[in-house]
Amino acid sequence: MLYNPGVLLAQLFGGQLKSSSSTYPTGTVHCKPQSRTAVVEVTNPITGEIWMDRNLGAEQVAISNTDALAFGDLYQWGRRADGHQCRISGTTSTLSNIDQPLHDDFILVPTSNNRDDWRSPQNNALWQGVAGINNPCPSGFRIPTSAEFTTERQSWSSNNSTGAFNSVLKLPLAGYRERTDGVVSLIAEGSPYGMLWTSTINNEEAIFFAYWSGNAFVNPYPRSRGYSVRCIKN
């Protein structure tokens, strides 16, 4: 299902979908300006939650869980959509001491870094709610919490990547970007993975939501890794 720029279409996909008039934050860098992510709402009929029907940066709703056009971008936790999230963005090893780095590079963090965060010192408020300092979601949307992803998972037909794709969210196996070298990989532990950030922090790390052929779960991980983002309506 393809969308022309500026045209929002809705299609029934197991749940209720409708177009939205939401706009992206000022300064948002779209990795593919000619096909910026359409804002279309999808409602989970079991939980009642309203989500975007695709990942940030995705060109279309996934038609399979390996649909590359549905993968979207890979964000470091807490960063705005400044271009670092583009899968082919440059890299830098210089940590940032401000909330909005003055560049579009993916910030590499060695494993020897005590906090393993792109920002030093850390700021826990960057992605908290619609008013989060660096919330990359369109107006009225935000990064979901760990609890919200857990509730979503519990509504699936199976607790794995099959359940993720068969759900109304049509979640693809979009991979991740490694924090130490900036390499993008679709494979983790020998299997394709889908990994999405939540807004929930856990001490010096943040909670991400992962799913693969064998399981789906939430877990803490260093904030400097690049994961997908799926926005939820506030």
Go through each PLM region and give its residues.
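N-terminal low-complexity, intrinsically disordered "leader/linker" segments enriched in small/polar
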Residues: 2-16
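C-terminal, surface-exposed recognition/capping segments
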Residues: 15-20, 30, 36-38, 44-84, ...
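Extracellular/luminal ectodomains of metazoan preproproteins built from arrays
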Residues: 26-28
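Core domains of carbohydrate- and sulfate-ester-processing enzymes
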Residues: 61, 82-97
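Extended terminal accessory/targeting regions
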Residues: 97, 101, 105-107
